[in-house]
Amino acid sequence: MQEWLNWPLSKSGMGQLIEGSNPSLSAIDIMKITIITIGKKHEAWVQPGVSRFLERLRAPFAAEMIILPHSSFEGDRARQEESERIFSRLNSDDFVILLDERGKNLSSPELSDLITEHIDKHIAFIIGGAYGVTSDLRQKSNIVWSLSNLVFPHQLVRLILAEQLYRAQEIHRGSHYHHS
């Protein structure tokens, strides 16, 4: 079974998808944002969109996406196993933002401000598996963020998050990408 997928960025900020490999130290050194998600690699319909937005991100908004395999179990056992996989990718001083439909709603400018406020730390965005995450991982999270009251497929959440990170970067830069 595939251990995980990683999307590191080069020094220029351009991304590439590497299957089953560890990120290079030089790629990690420039990273400030990591998206950790559970599930399969990107479906054909989502890959171009995620790629488009992640490749446009520049430091300090540069991001990597780590796709961890989903559990072969169901229910509580799956939630526990997947949360442990996520925990193994976190550092004790990470600023953790968990995406969950029961979280707090943030506008795009609020997200941009939140990232900018914590950009001196490593920021980890977490997209849990189909059964969610454990209460321990929820408590480790600094913010629980809801994209909407609606529930979305995980593939779509990855795309929305990638676009929102790009939008946050552009709001921070003062560009005309975001119209409010």
Show which residues each predicted segment covers.
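Short, Lys/Arg-enriched N-terminal segments with co-localized hydrophobic residues
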Residues: Q16-I30
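N-terminal beta1-alpha1 ligand-phosphate binding loop
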Residues: M31-F53, L57
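Short hydrophobic segments within beta-strands
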Residues: I36-I38, I66, I126
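Short, surface-exposed alpha-helical segments at coil->helix boundaries
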Residues: Q47-L54, Q80-S83, S135
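S-adenosyl-L-methionine/SAH cofactor-binding core of RNA-modifying enzymes
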Residues: F61-A63, I67-A124
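Structured adenosyl-cofactor binding patch, chiefly the S-adenosyl-L-methionine
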Residues: S135-H179
